[in-house]
C-alpha cells in the first residue's frame, strides 16, 4: 500500500523514543492490516481514503511517544468518523449497550472480513476480529469497572460470549476477549482514543 508512505507514519511509530516502550507491539504492521482489510472490502473513494489517513496521522500527533495508542482500533474508529459518522458519534456517546454495539458493527463491516475458515484471508480476518474484540472491551470500560463480555472460567467448560454475534466467529471472539484480559496496557476507556479524534475536530472548527 504505497499511499501510506506519503503520510510518513514511520515518523511516529518508528522513532527511537517510541521503540523504547513499544518495540514489540508491531504497531505499524497492525495499522496496515486493518487498513488493507477495510480498503479491500469497502467501496471507498480516493478522497475518503485520503481523509482517513490524514485524520489518523494528525490524531497520532496528539499522542506522546510513551503513550499507548492501539493503532488498529484508532484506524477503525477514524474510518467510522469519516465514513459512518452517525455510528461514530453514537459510539463516542455510548448510546449503545454491548449487544447494540455488536449489532451495529456487524451491520457496518462486510461479513467476508469475519470469515476465519478461508485459508487465503484467515490470518488477516482473525486479526480483524481481535481488533473488534479490543474495541468492544474498551467500550465496556465504565470508570474503574468493566462490563463482563464472556462467562467466567470454570473447570472443564469452555467460556462463552455474554452477547450474541450473528456473523462474527464466536470461538475466535472468545479467544480474542480472553487475550484482552491479559493485556496489561491494552484495555482502556475508548475515550482515550476518541477524545484525540474529537479534539482534532475542535482545531478544524
Regions found by a protein language model. Give the residues of each.
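The feature marks long, low-complexity, polar/acidic/proline-rich intrinsically disordered regions embedded
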Residues: 7-205
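A short helix-turn-beta junction within AAA+ P-loop NTPase domains corresponding to the substrate/partner-engaging
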Residues: 1-3
